């Protein structure tokens, strides 16, 4: 993966891109909240090397060195529009979009706003539908009547803690080398990321999700960690029903692709649903290349 910087309406946006220049199909791998493109380098490198995709890992506005959006532009549609500028910057007419958690919501917004540039969406443990915000943990029950926001925040932290043992199975030295710079930058610019968290908690993208599903034009592959406690399996089933696609359940929690970066590749190469999805992506790529009648 090679680092780069793009100018998006006068704001600096950092990204990395695989160096397989002969690849004919582009892909974008969108990160979760408080992460960055570097966290997904190992996964993207496998997708580039084995599937022949030219993979872009952007750092979304406010994260990992990319400049934040001003308050008046802080909305999901602006995030999606920024992706088109990255694609233009790199000369990519269309792309397969993979999104994790917050990035999955951005992926759905991109598919809704720019279907002509979307080859397909791999939606992973995403927050585009509202049920992920309905917390039923101990802290929400104890503090909900008095300070509901605090109860929700503590529940999210407790849910995140359940993923930490899973990360221990990762190749720690490799993970630290790729993820640490992004996490360090995010820690230093925490005030820039807090407004994004507020946006995610305040907004509901169910209508956009429903519209993309009802249109039926774009291939969608929902994937979910079986033991996800941050965005629970019920939210995965909700999303699958809205878009009319079965959810592919994988081993792990919310961060399943980080300790096991080969999982996504294996699903797309060897799983029946993943192979069917990739065939639909190739069909759509051929369709979008055809001249208008």
Annotate the PLM regions.
Residues 216, 222-224:
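Short beta-strand/loop motif that positions the catalytic acidic residue
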Residues 244-293:
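Catalytic active-site module of serine/aspartate enzymes centered on a nucleophile-bearing elbow/loop
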Residues 226-231, 255:
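Acidic catalytic loop of the alpha/beta-hydrolase fold
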Residues 99-103, 107:
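Gly/Ala-rich beta-loop-alpha elbow adjacent to hydrolase catalytic centers
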């Amino acid at each position: 993966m090679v680092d780069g910087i793009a100018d998006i309406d006068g704001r600096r946006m950092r990204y990395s891109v695989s160096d397989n220049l002969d690849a004919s199909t582009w892909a974008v791998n969108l990160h979760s909240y408080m992460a960055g493109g570097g966290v997904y380098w190992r996964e993207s490198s496998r997708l580039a090397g084995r599937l022949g995709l030219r993979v872009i890992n952007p750092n979304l506005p406010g994260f990992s060195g990319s400049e934040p959006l001003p308050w008046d532009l802080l909305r999901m549609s602006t995030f999606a529009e920024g992706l088109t500028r990255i694609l233009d910057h790199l000369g990519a007419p269309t792309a397969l979009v993979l999104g994790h958690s917050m990035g999955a919501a951005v992926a759905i917004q991109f598919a809704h706003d720019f279907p002509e540039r979307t080859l397909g969406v791999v939606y992973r443990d995403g927050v585009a539908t509202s049920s992920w915000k309905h917390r039923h943990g101990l802290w929400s029950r104890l503090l909900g009547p008095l300070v509901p926001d605090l109860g929700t925040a503590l529940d999210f932290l407790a849910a995140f803690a359940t993923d930490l043992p899973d990360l221990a199975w990762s190749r720690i030295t490799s993970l630290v080398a790729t993820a640490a710079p992004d996490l360090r930058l995010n820690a230093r610019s925490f005030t820039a990321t807090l407004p994004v968290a507020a946006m995610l908690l305040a907004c509901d993208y169910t209508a956009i999700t429903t519209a993309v599903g009802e249109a039926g034009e774009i291939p969608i592959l929902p994937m979910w960690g079986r033991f996800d406690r941050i965005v629970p399996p019920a939210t995965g089933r909700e999303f699958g029903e809205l878009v009319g696609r079965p959810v592919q359940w994988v081993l792990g929690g919310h961060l399943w692709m980080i300790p096991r970066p080969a999982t996504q590749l294996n699903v797309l190469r060897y799983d029946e649903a993943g192979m069917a999805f990739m065939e639909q992506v190739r069909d759509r790529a051929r369709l979008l290349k055809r001249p208008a009648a």
